[in-house]
Amino acid sequence: MTKRTKKVGITGKFGVRYGSSLRRQTKKLEVQQHAKYDCSFCGKRTVQRGATGIWNCKSCKKTVAGGAYTVSTAAAATVRSTIRRLRELAEA
């Protein structure tokens, strides 16, 4: 086997096309997209992206809606904390 790419990673398929900064942005997204994530139900690192915004756990077969490239987004975390705060205010 020959030595593979070190810097460009998954964006090596683009060659010299599209510019380095665009390839760098694409690399960041594609690495997040193809990574495995922890399942919030069973706790195993088996959640993979099925389609845009759909994440499937291979272990417990749960399907979760999330972000396009990651399971949870910053906006989703903000919404969760806001809902939690409003719920606490309503109970008090």
From Swiss-Prot:
Binding site for Zn(2+): C39, C42, C57, C60
Cross-referenced Pfam families: Ribosomal_L37ae (PF01780)
Molecular function (Gene Ontology), one example: structural constituent of ribosome
Swiss-Prot/TrEMBL cofactor(s): Zn(2+)
GO (cellular component) term, any one: cytosolic large ribosomal subunit
Keyword terms: Cytoplasm, Ribonucleoprotein, Ribosomal protein, Zinc
BP terms from Gene Ontology: translation
Keyword Transport set for record: no
Protein location: Cytoplasm
Function recorded in the entry: Component of the ribosome, a large ribonucleoprotein complex responsible for the synthesis of proteins in the cell. The small ribosomal subunit (SSU) binds messenger RNAs (mRNAs) and translates the encoded message by selecting cognate aminoacyl-transfer RNA (tRNA) molecules. The large subunit (LSU) contains the ribosomal catalytic site termed the peptidyl transferase center (PTC), which catalyzes the formation of peptide bonds, thereby polymerizing the amino acids delivered by tRNAs into a polypeptide chain.
NCBIfam families, per the entry: eL43_euk_arch (TIGR00280), PRK03976.1 (NF003058)
Record family assignment: Belongs to the eukaryotic ribosomal protein eL43 family.
Quaternary state and interactors: Component of the large ribosomal subunit. Mature ribosomes consist of a small (40S) and a large (60S) subunit. The 40S subunit contains 32 different proteins and 1 molecule of RNA (18S). The 60S subunit contains 45 different proteins and 3 molecules of RNA (25S, 5.8S and 5S).
Protein name (database record): Large ribosomal subunit protein eL43
Gene: RPL43A
